[in-house]
Amino acid sequence: MLKVVSILLGASLLFSTAQAGIWRKTSPRGNSLPKHEPPASFERRANTIFPIGVSSVLDDQPALLETNKFYSSFMIDGPERAAWTLPYIISVNDELPFGIQVAYPKSFEGEREGDRLKWYATTRTKDIILSAVELHTNQEVALADFDDAGLSALVTLSSPTEAGSMQTWLVRGMAYTTVLYNSYTPEVSSIHAIVRVNGRAVSGRTHTSSTGRFVLELNDDTTWIVYSSDTTLGLTYVSAVDDIPSVLKATKPMSGTLRVTRVPYEITTPEHPQYDAAVALLDQYSGSYPTKGSLTTWMHKTDTKRGKYQIKWTTAGDGSGLLHYAFPHHQDKVRSSTATRTGIYLASPTKGDMELLTGTTWIVNENTLPDFEWIPSMSGITYDRQMAWIMYYLEAEISVPLLKEEVAGASVYFGAKHLMAYCQLCLVAAELGSADLLETCLDQVEENFDEYLQHTNGNALVYDTVWGGVIGEEGLKEGNGAADFYASFYNDHHFHYSYVINVAAVLAHLRPSWIDDTKVAWVNTLIRDVNSPDASDPYFPQFRAFDWFSGHSWARGLLFAYDGKDQESTSEDVNFYYAMTMWGIATGNTLIEGLGRLQTGVVTRSINEYFLLKDDNQNHPPDFVKNKVTGIFFESKVDYTTWFGGNVEYIHGIQNIPATAITESVRDAEFCKQEWEQRLESVVETAEGTWNTVLYMSYATIQKNAAFEKILTSGSDAGLKRTWALYWAATRPPCDDFCSHDTVVLPHAPVVQTGAFSGVPATIPGRIEAEEYDLGGQGVGYSDTDPGNSGGQFRPSEAVDIQIFGEGYNVGWMRDGEYLRYTIEVSETGEWLRYFSVASPTSLGSFHVVTGGNGCGDNSAKNLSGMVAVPNTGGWANFAALGVAGNQPLSAGQTEIWLCVITGGFNLDFFDMSRRVL
């Protein structure tokens, strides 16, 4: 079968009619998002990675294959095929004896820095190998089936020369590894020496058991138990030969199951007090095994704080009941009426101790879901000088036009991130009631978001017909697979698209007229790519990124990693489900809104269990908890670093971007205080670039006024606007135990002077010195796209690059999209000649001069010059006069003109304007 759609027909048995009436199912269902073909604007393209080792029964619908699940290495061309079922790791043994190897990963420490452990990982050895005589020559391995929710998969092993097969189910949390033999002769082996079987020496005999139970004691002090459904099975010891380990070989072929499990406690002297209880429990449930999982989610119809999800395990075997491992975030939340805790634990590689539960139905109640707001309320701002500074920067930052290459260039991640940062200015303008600024802001966002909608951005999104998803076309080009962080191979989709969806949600909220069916379908397509809730969607897999068993998403797609799937940015994980929720609110889709609320709550709790490490965290080694955050989190390794560097500000900052209204629900004051005092306070002053602002925003949770003062002069860039950082800091709420928000006296925000440089407009006819552009700063008197004043010789507090030339100055380092504004007084109406003193070693530069409207980039502005091409003058200091005839009249009186750089690469000394004689 292609994919199993699990519809819980027995749900009414779990809930009374009255209870069912207050809950709304949010998945799986077919009407939360449309199932139609993705919009035609998404060009159809084939991925350069194709699935391998997939059974022919799945060939007709490859778009249903999951890319980011725990077993996806079975479908790609990598060095091994492994599945992190956890607590075990199951993989294919690609050397004799062929078959399935079962590893219980054991933790070991890596590098230290002082008293902190920088990373730890787990060993993976061939603790048990389940093979068959018929696989001695070769083996063929195929992924034969999987469930919709990413909880299980079925793998088949066979030989092209021998009849029969082996099948194994890869199920998250399975307590036993189960292999179904079909007319195959089982073999059991280990990389460790098998010392005893059922208490007897392993060699020199055939081992039998009237119950089909074989206790294997290994020389690493572990005990494994093998359960055979065929109680007549005999296992004969065969000594090791060359590189082939010794095996316990069955005396005959069988059709039935072998199940193997590790006793959770090692053999010690004296024995662990729960050793016997663990063995008894494993024996009791040895006859029943899970084959699939299904998922159902609900939101309360009237209480947005309440949601729940159900994982139902399908079983086979003797019906004795299911024994299954659960992570810490499940253990105290699973409804006891359907699943029972046993108090028997086995450590997972990176998520603490897993506990054995009994029962086939897990219902997890989430009764403290976070509140959802567009923006923190301005009522939190209690100091008028903070408000004045916010308004000062809001006006300045909104006035700077967006550049297409910055918000819609070759990276969807960076482009959409920058666009969302600007979009947050719109939210502030709306909250503060600044209608004019809001309209200007929304115009900019809408115009640039159209680049994505029209697929004219630098990395156009296309529909992948191989795996069923939306990817960037740049990564499909030969030799360019790493483009946009390997997003064409399903890396980081929930990070990238979270920003896009967030922008769309804000546009829909603040400008409802923007919404139409085409835009809704386009944005919904991105949601379907990452998080389709519909098990019957024929174009996208269900819940590609989100792992309902782990409680969070995985960023790694079709790229192999020895330590399993990974994720480093928990805040961007949250941002996707927050953005999806807000999109649901803005468009009136209550099902998507409800699902987003639930997933945000689930991931928030999981993040605080495993990624953000308070002092009392029990899920990681104590010396690793001292880092306060995990860094790169794999399924079987945790490394206090990032993919882009090991600076402390990177490692912590990536867990805190973007800051939104949901952030305070994820990062509470207790954690922020510990993180600040133990890791951030000592590095913040030397943090690179904008990262110090990110760290100060976290500090604002416990000291908002001190943080606000720091943010006035800390870094900012296109991805984090100073306005938003200040607003977020100023609106931090009070807290009783972990913050104080001490009073800080701020300087007054400047009153922005605008207009002519000297206070008097330049008289026309006459000369205008290039460096005497208008007052008002960035976005008013000028727009400069590179940081700082590169010349630093004149007006050093402003970003225009000015250098000494002769007895005066010139403006240099001109870049695409920059402009200079000049206020002039025109003596009489008419057309005017212009002579520009320019210098350039190339003939690539160009500009034009406009007047009216909002200047450069405003279609209503009057172009006074047409495009002016700058010639090669022989060098940066060889200035030449460039004459340009006026082609549009200027009216007498005061006006503003803008010199708009089209293509940079030239210097400007001055320009003269004289009356054109007609």
Predicted regions and their residues:
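Active-site neighborhood of glycoside hydrolase catalytic domains
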Residues: 570-574, 579-603
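Extracytoplasmic
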Residues: 750-918
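Structural helix-adjacent loops and short alpha-helical linkers that scaffold large soluble proteins
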Residues: 429-443, 508-523, 584-597
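Ser/Thr/Asn(+Pro)-rich, low-complexity disordered segments
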Residues: 3, 19-482, 486-487, 491-492, ...
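Aromatic-rich carbohydrate-recognition surfaces in CAZymes
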Residues: 409-430, 487-527, 569-577
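Classical eukaryotic N-terminal signal peptides for Sec-dependent ER targeting/secretion
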Residues: 1-9
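Active/binding-pocket-proximal capping segment
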Residues: 519-527, 547-548, 593-604, 840
